[in-house]
């Protein structure tokens, strides 16, 4: 297989990274895609950095063994915990990682008040603190950890009463602070954008990084002459949890029925 025809490997703690996978498919339709959901260990946001690094190394090895030409770490928490180590582990492999959209949010806010929804792990990370120091010194940032929200999305409950009640409670402090810009600091959260739109004023800008990651992947592949052309192979999916559970959720979050393999690492 020519290097440019090799697939791109994408992984996340669960199904949240499918929001990034959708953006990659839309921008780079010729790329063949591999996706790993580490659902048996979700959410990463409540795990130790060492634990997350070990999981990311195992999954990275798995995807490279299946011919991935590049890796996309489609998880903010995993990026904070493991991106630097993965780049050292795979020095020849392009790695695109996630981080909360602090820079574009700081540029977009009109009143200087920005809210952040993210996992505890992301909000406590040195990487997030560095982003605030670098890009948000002139704005006020109000952070809100979101325990339980990833689990609701993993269950496919994007519009139900329990998810609505949880989001209302999580959004309360941010709305009270008068934020006019909201960062979705977890790849799971774009799936509840329609529900968010019902719960916040229409003039609040909601920012996530999925499209930016797809653009960065395009730049990285182009620089290394690895952009695919022609017909992409069908995407392949694996989960560390029950394949039938992910097969149930894929039509909701990905838009089509797919077969899912079992990840045993």
Curated annotation (Swiss-Prot):
- Please report which protein family the annotation says this sequence is part of: Belongs to the aspartate/glutamate racemases family.
Top-level lineage group: Bacteria
Function comment? Provides the (R)-glutamate required for cell wall biosynthesis.
Q: Which reaction does it catalyse?
A: L-glutamate = D-glutamate
Q: What is this protein called?
A: Glutamate racemase
> Cross-referenced Pfam families, in alphabetical order?
Asp_Glu_race
User: Which pathway is recorded for this entry?
Assistant: Cell wall biogenesis; peptidoglycan biosynthesis
UniProt: substrate binding residues: 12-13, 44-45, 76-77, 187-188
Q: Which InterPro entries match?
A: Asp/Glu/hydantoin_racemase, Asp/Glu_race, Asp/Glu_racemase_AS_1, Asp/Glu_racemase_AS_2, Glu_race
Is the keyword Cell inner membrane assigned to this protein?
A: no
User: Biological process GO annotation list?
Assistant: cell wall organization; peptidoglycan biosynthetic process; regulation of cell shape
MF terms per GO, please?
A: glutamate racemase activity
Enumerate the active-site residues. 75 (proton donor/acceptor), 186 (proton donor/acceptor)
| Keyword annotations from UniProtKB, A to Z | Cell shape, Cell wall biogenesis/degradation, Isomerase, Peptidoglycan synthesis
What is the E.C. number? 5.1.1.3
Cite the PROSITE patterns for this sequence.
ASP_GLU_RACEMASE_1, ASP_GLU_RACEMASE_2
């Amino acid at each position: 297989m020519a290097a440019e025809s090799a697939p791109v490997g994408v992984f996340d703690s669960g199904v949240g990274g499918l929001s990034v996978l959708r953006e990659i498919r839309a921008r780079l339709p010729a790329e063949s895609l591999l996706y790993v959901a580490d659902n048996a260990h979700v959410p990463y946001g409540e795990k130790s950095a060492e634990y997350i690094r070990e999981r990311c190394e195992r999954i990275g090895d798995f995807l490279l063994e299946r011919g991935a030409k590049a890796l996309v770490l489609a998880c903010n928490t995993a990026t904070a915990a493991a991106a630097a180590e993965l780049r050292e582990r795979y020095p020849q492999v392009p790695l695109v990682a996630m981080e909360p959209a602090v820079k574009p949010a700081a540029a977009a806010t009109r009143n200087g008040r920005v809210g952040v929804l993210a996992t505890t792990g992301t909000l406590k990370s040195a990487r997030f603190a560095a982003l605030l120091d670098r890009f948000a010194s002139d704005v006020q940032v109000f952070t809100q950890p979101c325990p339980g929200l990833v689990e609701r999305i993993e269950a496919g409950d994007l519009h139900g009463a329990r998810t609505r009640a949880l989001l209302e409670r999580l959004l309360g402090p941010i709305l009270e602070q008068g934020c006019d810009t909201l960062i979705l600091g977890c790849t799971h959260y774009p799936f509840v954008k329609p529900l968010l739109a019902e719960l916040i004023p229409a003039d609040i800008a909601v920012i996530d990084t999925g499209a930016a990651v797809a653009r960065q992947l395009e730049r990285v592949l182009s620089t290394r002459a690895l952009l695919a052309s022609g017909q992409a192979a069908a995407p392949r999916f694996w989960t560390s949890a029950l394949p039938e559970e992910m097969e149930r959720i894929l039509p909701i979050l990905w838009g089509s029925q797919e077969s899912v393999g079992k990840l045993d690492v």
